[in-house]
A protein has these predicted regions:
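C-terminal soluble interaction/assembly domains
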Residues: 89-93, 424-429, 440
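A short, acidic, flexible beta-alpha connecting loop/helix-capping segment that sits on the rim
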Residues: 13-16, 23-24, 453-458
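Short glycine-rich beta-strand segments
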Residues: 202-206, 255-259, 304-313, 348-352, ...
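Periplasmic polypeptide-binding modules associated with outer-membrane biogenesis and secretion
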Residues: 24-146, 158-160, 172-191, 323-327, ...
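Conserved catalytic block of serine-dependent lipid acyl chemistry
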Residues: 1-14, 26, 31
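C-terminal outer-membrane beta-barrel translocator/porin domains of Gram-negative envelope proteins
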Residues: 145, 281-286, 290-402
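Gram-negative/organellar outer-membrane beta-barrel architecture
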Residues: 102, 108, 116-290, 294, ...
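Outer-membrane beta-barrel transmembrane domain signature
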Residues: 271, 279, 333-340, 356, ...
Length: 471
């Protein structure tokens, strides 16, 4: 009873909750301030002859044993969906940081208006009790802008619909209007740690001048150094995936792709470079712990992918079944406050008989949405160098000199060509290198980036602009 209390100390902690673990120092300061306010009253209670001896502090654990996870009944989502967003299962020891990260992930889905949770002792550990209030909004419309040197200017209209057919599902359509009409259609049923499934359909196109020598023997015959092409890619995937060891996304699926590459600068009635259908199976393993996709300050990512092309309508009469393996790893960390170093390495190889070159790895350019095996590379223009195998390493120093304003310096090195892993040549000094200095600004419309890039192998430099989220 407060009225019967001789000295009542009440810190001002109304801005904190029972899970404000990252605000511990601030909460302690609030307690000290409230205590010093009644210091004289406390001093009057002490004895000069028998001073209080503070016992040794017992450090409590920064982790908790979660024995069970209980979720209130939901109309449009299952408990498996919610537990999957937490990224940990019952009967698991987790840190409070991981608990907070899981709650933040649930909040980030924007599927719930209110999230109340508590840890309740159950004799063996703690039961995590979640009480969620669903967001009644199911249809969302979003708009976006983007510009890069490959797809040029684009306006995005995205419409998404939750619970279109089932609980936990989400359908999303990106209609991209601009210099190159494109779309992305995605339907996904998210069952958390259980097997989830989905369908993707994408259409991408662009027009570009490409060096005829980008592949051995040239893209077309004759004494032609540069070709203007229309590139069109229509890809459809059906896949399933799950969460592996509570961290990695692991999945597999089937793919149908139609690829059309038309030469514009050749004779009017010249045949298409390719106009074929391709059927393949694929598998992947993914992990992403970056705190920011475009300007990460901590975390790491990994992607491993295997793609086996089994059949084709074979318009070029040169198709043979083949498999592409590729992997990408990146890590970011702070060197000093405001200065971040990001290291990235990726590699790929084609296995099997000599086949069509249209799925070779192609390096060059920056800031574009990936399609097939086109990869960014500082120092070279878009789609400049290619081969059926490659290895690349890159490093970036990023300095945030003012809030959301970044200055960065990047360097990348690569070996690329046909069958480079059949000998130790890939382990030699890099054949290709490039550097870039840039400025980046984080805005509500996405990042705005300006980069100037050059290579010691070429006297020509490139200025690249990327505006808005990449799509």
């Amino acid at each position: 009873n407060i009225k019967k209390t001789t000295i009542y100390i009440k810190p001002d902690i109304k801005d904190y909750t029972v899970v404000s673990f990252d605000k511990g120092k601030e909460i302690i300061v609030k307690g000290e301030e409230a205590t010093f306010a009644v210091y004289e009253q406390l001093k009057a209670l002490t004895s000069e002859t028998q001073r209080y001896q503070k016992p040794k502090m017992k450090v409590s654990s920064d982790s908790v044993f979660v024995t069970d996870i209980k979720v209130n009944e939901l109309k449009n989502f299952t408990s498996a969906y919610v537990k999957g967003k937490l990224r940990f299962k019952p009967v698991t020891i987790i840190t409070y940081d991981k608990l907070q990260s899981g709650i933040n992930t649930i909040n980030g889905t924007q599927n719930f208006n209110a999230i109340n949770y508590a840890l309740e002792p159950d004799g063996y550990g703690e039961t995590l009790v979640l009480n969620l209030k669903e967001n009644e909004t199911k249809t969302l419309l979003k708009l976006g802008l983007h510009y890069d040197g490959l797809y040029k200017s684009a306006v995005l209209a995205n419409i998404s619909q939750k619970n279109l057919f089932f609980k936990n599902d989400n359908a999303s359509l990106d209609l991209i209007i601009g210099d190159n009409l494109r779309y992305n259609l995605d339907y996904y049923v998210d069952n958390g740690f259980n097997i989830s499934f989905g369908f993707k359909s994408t259409f991408a196109q662009f027009n570009r001048n490409v060096a005829n020598s980008i592949q051995p023997g040239g893209i077309v015959g004759g004494d032609i150094s540069l070709i203007n092409i229309d590139f069109k890619d229509w890809t459809n995937q059906a896949y399933f995936q799950s969460v592996f060891v509570q961290k990695f996304l692991i999945g597999a699926g089937l793919e149908y792709k139609h690829l059309q590459i038309v030469p514009i600068t050749i004779a009017k009635n010249s045949p298409d470079i390719d106009n074929s259908n391709y059927f393949s199976v694929f598998g992947y393993l993914k992990y992403d712990a970056f705190d920011n996709k475009y300007f990460p300050t901590k975390g790491w990512t990994f992607t491993g992918d295997i793609h086996s092309y089994l059949m084709s309508s074979n318009q070029t009469k040169t198709f043979n079944p083949f498999t592409i393996l590729k992997a990408d790893f990146a890590v970011a960390f702070k060197v000093i406050p405001k200065l971040v170093f990001k290291f990235q390495t990726d590699a790929g190889v084609s296995i099997g008989e000599k086949s069509v070159p249209f799925f070779d790895f192609v390096l060059g350019g920056y800031g574009f949405a990936p399609v097939n095996n086109f990869k960014p590379f500082y120092g070279y223009d878009f789609l400049s160098i290619g081969g059926d195998s490659y290895i690349k390493t890159a490093g970036t120093l990023d300095y945030e000199f003012y809030k959301k304003n970044h200055f960065n310096f990047s360097a990348n090195f690569a070996n690329i060509g046909d069958k480079i892993f059949s000998s130790l040549d890939w382990f030699s000094l890099p054949k290709y290198s490039g550097y870039a200095v840039g400025y980046g600004l984080e805005t509500i419309l996405g990042p705005i980036e300006v980069k100037y890039s050059w290579s010691p192998e070429d006297s020509k430099g490139f200025a690249w602009f990327s505006i808005g989220y990449v799509f």
